[in-house]
């Protein structure tokens, strides 16, 4: 593969091992409202990279009782539950090693379906925030993954044409998003052994 013009990394499940923490936060919020069994682990991983509000919209389509709640408030509750768990986050060394290898040689960014402040906190706690020139969070875009907008915005902010970008990603929605943006994708699940929730 020729040297890319830029590298864009997903955050959760790619750079940092946060997926089990997100799963726990989802269940803390859902269990508190009596929805213990509506979000099994396989469905959770299928939504990797999708903003929390979009996940709740999907869950509400399939569980009528959830529609009685303010989904924006539930989104906030989930994010607060996750934020309380962030101090225990660790990095995924195989992928962080790749970021360190390219640091200072190629512009790099993080493109996440999570809130930017939470993404920054995860990167700060793991000591890798300074590797990245740009961080895109869910609040920066109108359409999250699998729409191409998040990765296109990352490329734009780095000043690199999308077709010259390579994306490191672990989730199906991220793969779809990156391919739709015209970018090459590295499936990091082949490199790492993720902790199951």
Regions found by a protein language model. Give the residues of each.
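N-terminal polybasic phosphate/anion-binding patch
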Residues: 28-57, 61-62
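Helix N-cap/coil-helix junction residues
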Residues: 35-37, 65-66, 128, 159-160
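A metal-dependent, Asp-based hydrolase signature
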Residues: 48-84
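Short beta->alpha linker loops
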Residues: 21, 50-51, 77, 90-94, ...
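Active-site neighborhood of HAD-like aspartate-dependent phosphohydrolases
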Residues: 1-42, 180-181, 195
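Short, acidic loop-to-helix structural element flanking the phosphoryl-transfer center
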Residues: 83-110, 116
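Asp-based, Mg2+/Mn2+-dependent phosphohydrolase catalytic module
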Residues: 1-5, 96-97, 115-197
């Amino acid at each position: 593969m020729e040297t890319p013009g830029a590298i864009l990394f997903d955050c959760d499940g790619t750079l940092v091992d946060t997926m089990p923490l997100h799963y726990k936060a989802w269940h803390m919020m859902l269990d508190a409202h009596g929805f213990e069994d509506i979000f099994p682990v396989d469905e959770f991983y299928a939504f990797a990279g999708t903003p929390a509000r979009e996940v709740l919209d999907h869950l509400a389509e399939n569980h009528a009782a959830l529609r009685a709640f303010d989904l924006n408030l539930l989104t906030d509750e989930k994010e607060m539950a996750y934020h309380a768990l962030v101090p225990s986050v660790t990095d995924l060394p195989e992928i962080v090693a790749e970021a360190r290898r390219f640091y200072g040689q190629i512009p790099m960014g993080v493109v996440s379906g999570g809130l930017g402040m939470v993404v920054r906190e995860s990167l700060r706690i793991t000591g890798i925030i300074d590797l990245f020139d740009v961080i895109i969070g869910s609040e920066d875009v109108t359409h999250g993954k699998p729409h191409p907008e998040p990765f296109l915005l990352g490329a734009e902010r780095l000043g690199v044409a999308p077709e010259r970008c390579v994306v490191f990603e672990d989730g199906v929605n991220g793969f779809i998003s990156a391919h739709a943006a015209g970018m090459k994708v590295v499936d990091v699940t082949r490199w790492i052994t993720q902790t199951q929730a």
